[in-house]
Amino acid sequence: MQIRNVLIVGGGTAGWMTATALVKLCPHIKTSLIESKDQPIIGVGESTLGQINDFFALLDLTDEEWMKETGSTYKSNIRFTDFYKKGETWDYPFGKSTIVNDLPHGWMSWFALNIEKPEKFTRDTFARSMNIIGHLAYANKLTRCDKFPFDHDTAYHMDAVKFGQWLRDNRCQEVDHMYGEITGCVKDEHGNIDVLYARNKELKYDLYIDCTGFISVLLEGLMKVPFKSFHVNEGGCLLNDTAVTCHMPH
């Protein structure tokens, strides 16, 4: 079946990121999006990893375009305070280490120095051995060098709600944007959604994408696809299902 038109259900960050990707990469496909005016958007001040830069590269999206408008900041690594010992920290580094003789130089440098001077090159110095940006972060600075590889050495802290709205307003002008509540569907002979209903309005598309988050209007609600938990008590591998957010000294 040739996909000629797509309906995205849900207008949060995931919905508008999906719409942006379709507009950019599949301009021959007619993209539509329907969202509820009454359903709040999930957003807790998202923290990303460096892999998000691959997505931005697909969209030809530059930091100068969106960061200021969305209240975003750069993120250079993840620090675990009191992680393995009270008063000690461990940093999870971002970026690509320098390659020497087909080996990641940052890793090898740290292990060699750790053996030679274990009292100085402790575990909390690992990130700074991987990449120069660790040194900058400890000095509370970030380079202004135009050639610095921000595309893989950094990630972002962002207001996800504002980011989704920015994509909507700046990258999705071609999207047919609607408001409404999905109330039902008609399925085809294979059990797939053929037609959606938004109250009394009929919506028929070649492909439907569920971006409704935890509510899962299409997958769980209409298709009855069971939610698969990663919690260890339910056969998964996730030991922790709770997070406490707080400000650390910085």
Task: Locate each region found by the language model.
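N-terminal Rossmann-like FAD-binding beta1-loop-alpha1 element of flavoenzymes
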Residues: 4-29
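Terminal, non-catalytic protein-protein interaction segments that mediate quaternary/complex assembly
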Residues: 13, 26, 34, 58-63, ...
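Short, solvent-exposed loop/turn segments at secondary-structure junctions
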Residues: 13-14, 38-39, 49, 183-185, ...
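Glycine-rich FAD pyrophosphate-binding loop
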Residues: 23-44
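A short, surface-exposed helix-loop junction/capping segment
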Residues: 32-36, 143-152
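Dinucleotide-binding Rossmann-like beta1-alpha1 core, especially the glycine-rich loop
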Residues: 44-136
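Predominantly flavin-linked oxidoreductase catalytic cores and closely associated redox partners
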Residues: 148-250
